[in-house]
Swiss-Prot record:
GO terms for cellular component: cytoplasm. Its EC number is 2.4.99.17. Pathway: tRNA modification; tRNA-queuosine biosynthesis. Keywords: Cytoplasm, Queuosine biosynthesis, S-adenosyl-L-methionine, Transferase. Pfam families: Queuosine_synth (PF02547). Belongs to the QueA family. It comes from Sulfurihydrogenibium sp. (strain YO3AOP1). This is S-adenosylmethionine:tRNA ribosyltransferase-isomerase. The gene is queA. GO terms for biological process: queuosine biosynthetic process; tRNA wobble guanine modification. Monomer.
Length: 336
């Protein structure tokens, strides 16, 4: 398939800059794969599509305040360090603009006793050492929420809450698993009361999630890697759900990537670079809750594999017409 097969026109004003409040009051477009019908609901109505014995799988990763803004030692020039992932104690893989201008061991001062030391350049990434008495507390204090570039505004204090799911638990993401943002604690409680199982996986979302596809032949695209783990109790719940012929409902493309890596390769922990595009035979996932994705993105390819490309593009064009809100802070879609 070609990259141009996954394009659609999106007016810029439909890109959400802030999320709906309360979280579960955003719009929900429901796509039925069997009869190709589309319904327009509110997110909290998602409970109507879940049955006792079904299993809802959520990604409990937690977004770290990954953007650090500091000053170069000696020159005092402003510079941004974007943390990607820890390699070992205090050594991080990062993105730094104009990294070529940095000298080995040059310091980037964030505060009096919190600074970043540039070690080396690896591909487009910069390897740094973080000097801090308490990294976690310094990141909370000085780090900025890593909002996606298309939101086109500076992060605000309230984004620390908005851009984190209510069940975030395991630190490590530099982008939010956004389908999970729509759930409130109350809605999850009601879902449990209905007899639906709730299970968790962890997949740390990397910046690669925003990486554009540059090859017209999509099969030539090199997919980014992300670290994931599926706990034993979740595996047992998946098995039980399948045995009872109930539905496995994935909340977000990150959950799909983790579960399908397990379904296809039997892997329950480690890095996954699974690239799902049509035609793909899903092994685990029966229903999918997701947001509206960027044109020509790997995430749009994944949902097109799940539902059918023509149906998805018809739904997206309908969403534009109905003025749905798009991307990370936007509205949601349920595919049954």
């Amino acid at each position: 398939m070609k990259l141009s097969d996954f394009d659609y026109h999106l007016p810029k004003e439909l890109i959400a800059k802030y999320p709906a409040q309360p979280r579960d009051s955003c719009r929900l477009m429901v796509l039925n794969r069997k009869d190709k019908t589309i319904e327009h609901r509110i997110f909290r109505d998602v409970i109507d599509y879940l049955k006792p014995g079904d299993t809802l799988v959520l990604n409990n990763t937690k977004v770290i305040p990954a953007r650090l803004i500091g000053k170069k030692e000696k020159t005092n020039a402003n510079i941004e360090v974007f943390l990607l992932r820890p390699i070992e104690d205090n050594i991080w893989e990062t993105l730094i603009k104009n990294v070529r201008r940095l000298k080995k061991n040059q310091k980037i001062i964030i505060s009096d006793d919190f600074y970043v030391e540039f070690l080396s350049k690896d591909d487009e990434k910069a390897i740094v050492k973080i000097h801090s008495k308490d990294i976690k507390s310094d990141l909370e204090k000085y780090g900025h929420v890593p909002l996606p570039p298309y939101i086109e505004r500076e992060d605000e204090e309230k984004d620390k809450d908005y851009y984190q799911t209510v069940f975030a638990d395991k630190e490590g993401s530099v982008a939010s698993p956004t389908a999970g943002l729509h759930f409130t604690k109350e809605l999850l409680e009601k879902i449990k009361e209905k007899g639906v199982n709730i299970a968790y996986i962890t997949l740390h979302v990397g910046l690669g999630t925003f990486k554009p596809v540059k090859t017209e032949d999509i099969t030539k695209h090199k997919m980014h890697e992300e670290y994931f783990t599926i706990p034993k109790e979740t595996l047992e719940m998946i098995k039980k759900t399948k045995e009872n012929k109930k539905s496995l409902v994935a909340v977000g493309t990150t959950v799909v990537r983790a579960l399908e890596t397990y379904g296809k390769f039997g892997k329950t922990e480690g890095f996954t670079d699974i690239f799902i595009y049509p035609p793909y035979e899903f092994k685990i996932v029966d229903k999918l809750i997701t947001n509206f994705h960027l044109p020509k993105s790997t995430l749009l390819m994944l949902v097109s594999a799940f539902a059918d490309r023509d149906f998805i593009l018809r739904a997206y064009n309908g969403a534009v017409k109905e003025k749905y809100r798009f991307f990370s802070y936007g509205d949601a879609m349920l595919i049954v």
